[in-house]
């Protein structure tokens, strides 16, 4: 492995990876990015061949001194240790969400901590914007990315994790262009007083990047970290759709004054719905600022930004396109069952065992069923429970995607019309640390209704 604290990239072989292996497992390759005390390498898991990212953070151990006599270097080293602890704790707590980068492993030497992370090979959103020559995303593309960001932030908040440094540099893209929220080193925890610095749920620590920081932080007030994250998300949304910062000035104090006054102007190409959402997020008063859970109900996010069969359902959900295609292929396989196979099953019969055991997934056959009634019932119950519901119907199939605003539950229900007016109904739970009432109803077949 590279020498502890070595600032140079490891010598790479012809395939781009180092001959030396980090702790017998990870072959380090080129540097993907670096900060004042850390570097991120592209790496390969020697055991599995999987490509990963390794974040190397120098600890720079300092001699022990009385806290009042610590040098600036020692204080910086102590801060880095706290940030590493926070990042690891936060990533472990929010693991499993499709739009949060996954922590795979943690390694350490006397001088360096290595975080092995899911590789997002598409680079950062900032790099993507720069590659457009200072351009911006159109609204459908921005809506897709922003929905993924909002889902990740809502998920983190529901688990008591507040990021506090949301900016394009910390938003990565995978090979499909889906977003991953990363770098939780400045995060705060709702249930840990030592992180919030208070016992009333209000943060006291002032952190984050100046252009993305909420006014209440600049004014050195105690603040609600969840509302500060919403402000940062609003700045990100502006940058995605405008291509530049809403508050920018060569003079830092002048920029701070603009932020505190919320003085900004959307470009002329922004729709009224987009202007409305940005305005709600960049509200200088935290008490009236839109909440993360309310964002999903805003008209701008409710628009269908895609012409594909499931459009926004695919764009904002946990399913990537390959997963959706696999799912549809499995349904096509199920449709190949002949009429004799199908008609022998009673109404509401669970086909999971016939097609193959799949975790968190149930399939039913309903002879003589009505697809609209099934979808109506799923949609009604989902909305009654406060879930975000999106529905799409075609001649021979229909589907409903439901998602909790907390990010703790995501599911699909899809109905396919088979020969002889038989319905094939499949429900799949993608994320499920919360189990809404309607999911229990689905499992026992209570939503399978006839005309």
From Swiss-Prot:
SUPFAM superfamilies: Protein kinase-like (PK-like) (SSF56112). CIPK serine-threonine protein kinases interact with CBL proteins. Binding of a CBL protein to the regulatory NAF domain of CIPK protein lead to the activation of the kinase in a calcium-dependent manner. PANTHER family: CALCIUM/CALMODULIN-DEPENDENT PROTEIN KINASE KINASE-RELATED, CBL-INTERACTING PROTEIN KINASE 22. Residues 330-356 form the NAF domain. It comes from Oryza sativa subsp. japonica. Induction: By drought and salt stresses and abscisic acid (ABA). Transmembrane segments: none annotated. Residues 183-216 are annotated as: Activation loop. PROSITE patterns: NAF (PS50816), PROTEIN_KINASE_ATP (PS00107), PROTEIN_KINASE_DOM (PS50011), PROTEIN_KINASE_ST (PS00108). Keywords: ATP-binding, Kinase, Manganese, Nucleotide-binding, Serine/threonine-protein kinase, Transferase. Its cofactor is Mn(2+). The gene is CIPK22. This is CBL-interacting protein kinase 22. InterPro entries: Kinase-like_dom_sf, NAF/FISL_domain, NAF_dom, Prot_kinase_dom, Protein_kinase_ATP_BS, Ser/Thr_kinase_AS. The keyword Protease does not apply. It catalyses: L-seryl-[protein] + ATP = O-phospho-L-seryl-[protein] + ADP + H(+); L-threonyl-[protein] + ATP = O-phospho-L-threonyl-[protein] + ADP + H(+). Belongs to the protein kinase superfamily. CAMK Ser/Thr protein kinase family. SNF1 subfamily. Its EC number is 2.7.11.1.
